[in-house]
Regions:
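Short acidic-hydrophobic surface loop/beta-edge motif
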Residues: 82-91, 167-169
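Conserved beta-sheet core of the metallophosphoesterase superfamily
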Residues: 131, 136-188
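Active-site glycine-centered loops adjacent to acidic/histidine catalytic or metal-binding residues
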Residues: 13-14, 48-49, 127, 159-160, ...
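Short, glycine/charged-enriched secondary-structure capping and boundary segments
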Residues: 24-27, 58-62, 111-112, 137-141, ...
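Core catalytic region of metal-dependent phosphoesterases/phosphodiesterases
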Residues: 1-85, 149-153
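Hydrophobic/aromatic residues located in beta-strands of well-ordered beta-sheets
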Residues: 9, 43-45, 96, 122, ...
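Binuclear metal-dependent hydrolase catalytic cores centered on His/Asp/Glu-rich metal-binding motifs
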Residues: 87-149
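A structural signal for the main folded, soluble domain(s) of proteins
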Residues: 1-6, 105, 110-115, 121-124, ...
Length: 188
C-alpha cells in the first residue's frame, strides 16, 4: 500500500520513437498508456530526442501535441511547464532539476534552490549522453555532457542510452534505467 500523492513515475524522454511521424493509433495508444500510469501515481514526462525534430524546433513536437489535446489529470510535461527551457520545479520535498533538450541542457540554478530549500532532495532529469556512459553495443561515450553539470544534484534520472547502468560521478548516482520498451537485442 502506498500514498498515490507521494509517488512519481518519471519518463526521461523518448516516449515516442518516430519524432514527428505520428499516426492516430500512436496518439491513442500513448494517451491510453499515460492515463493508465497516472492512475498509479503522478507522471512526469521529459522530452527526448525522439519526441521532437531537433533541427527544426519551430515544428510542434509530438509531446506538445499529445499534452495539448489529451487533458491529463495527473500527468505533467515538464519541458512545457518551464517554457521549453531548463529549470527547476519544486514538488513537495523534491526539486526536479530539468536539463531540457530544447535549450541544449543549460544547467538549472540548483545552488540557489539548495540554499532556499536545504531539506529538499534535488533530482536531475536529463535525456542525453553523459561522458563515460556505456552504449548498448559496449562502446564508451567520450562526448556529451560532463558529469560536472550535475553537481548539486542528489541523483540524476537519465534517458537516451538504452542500456541500464548507474554511473557514480562526484558522489552522484546518474541512473539510466534502460528502455521503456526493448527495441533491439542489445538493450536487454
Amino acid at each position: 500500500e502506498y500514498d498515490k500523492d507521494e509517488v512519481r513515475i518519471v519518463i526521461s524522454g523518448d516516449l515516442f520513437e518516430s519524432k514527428n511521424t505520428v499516426s492516430n493509433e500512436l496518439m491513442t495508444f500513448s494517451s491510453f498508456f499515460l492515463r493508465q500510469l497516472e492512475e498509479i501515481a503522478q507522471v512526469l514526462v521529459l522530452a527526448g530526442n525522439h519526441d521532437l525534430v531537433l533541427d527544426n524546433t519551430s515544428r510542434t513536437d509530438t509531446l506538445t501535441a499529445l499534452f495539448d489535446t489529451a487533458n491529463f489529470d495527473n500527468c505533467k510535461f515538464l519541458d512545457a511547464m518551464l517554457g521549453y527551457t531548463s529549470g527547476c520545479i519544486k514538488d513537495g520535498n523534491i526539486i526536479w532539476a530539468v536539463y531540457s533538450i530544447y535549450d541544449s541542457y543549460i544547467r538549472p540554478d540548483i545552488d540557489e534552490l539548495k540554499e532556499e530549500y536545504p531539506s529538499c532532495k534535488i533530482i536531475g532529469l536529463y535525456h542525453g549522453l553523459v561522458v563515460g556512459a556505456t552504449m548498448d553495443n559496449g562502446s564508451i561515450i567520450d562526448g556529451g555532457t560532463d558529469s560536472d553539470a550535475f553537481n548539486g544534484c542528489d541523483c540524476v534520472m537519465a534517458g537516451h542510452i538504452h542500456k541500464r547502468q548507474v554511473l557514480r560521478r562526484n558522489g552522484i548516482n546518474i541512473v539510466y534505467p534502460g528502455s521503456l520498451i526493448q527495441q533491439r537485442f542489445g538493450e536487454t
